[in-house]
Amino acid sequence: MDLFNYFRRETTEVNIGAVPLGGPNSIRVQSMTNTSTQDTQACVEQAKRIVDAGGEYVRLTTQGIKEAENLMNINIGLRSQGYMVPLVADVHFNPKVADVAAQYAEKVRINPGNYVDAARTFKKLEYTDEEYAQEIQKIHDRFVPFLNICKKNHTAIRIGVNHGSLSDRIMSRYGDTPAGMVESCMEFLRICVEENFTDVVISIKASNTVVMVKTVRLLVDVMEKEGMAFPLHLGVTEAGDGEDGRIKSALGIGALLSDGLGDTCLLYTSPSPRDP
């Protein structure tokens, strides 16, 4: 890294609807709705406000099958009014929801910490090498069908790791560390590479900005060693509201942007996505 000459990391281009990410494209800005994803009209109106304020992607919480299915209606509502913004489905815990969302959203976010592995319970703290390998095979067996759905529907994905939701399996081997967060992400990226699926964006977030910055830098180093150049989504989880949240987000995101890292930024630190 050259401290005196800015150089942006070269990444692969990812197709997300009509708004590509990474590669030669500018750093994209996105925000997230805080409306119920089952409320079509409320989501459409808030998404329009995000776009009018400069947002290039709109992310929606997608807790269940009903929310995933309603993404179709939200998409129709936006496009009927001339808003072609790509929608991003934010999925947790249930891979079946991701399968449905991939049919209607332009991008689907999954969390490696709870996509296949059970939520963190601390009930199983030790895994043999054989057990560990079996769990990774389970991820492969469940993740590949999802990738095939995404290929069929031209849907991109974001592999989004959160510091607070690492699985028991990762915790058993790496602890609550940047290395554990990176490996949680890399397990999924390696499968994407094996399956020749390249429309992938990645994120690693933590509420502690120091941990977040250190982990993203480590991830980039590991990816480069394995010949990967996937684009980065930057954000600080649980940044907080108001001025404190904006300062915290700016510190974490700004440090990485100054390193030349980052292809899109998620900003949502106010009650309404458009509020200052």
Label each region the model flagged.
Residues Y268-P276:
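Single conserved hydrophobic/aromatic residue that forms the stacking wall/gate
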Residues V29, D90, I159, I202, ...:
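Conserved, mostly hydrophobic/aromatic
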Residues M1-Q30:
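N-terminal amphipathic alpha-helix/helix-capping segment at the start of soluble metabolic enzymes
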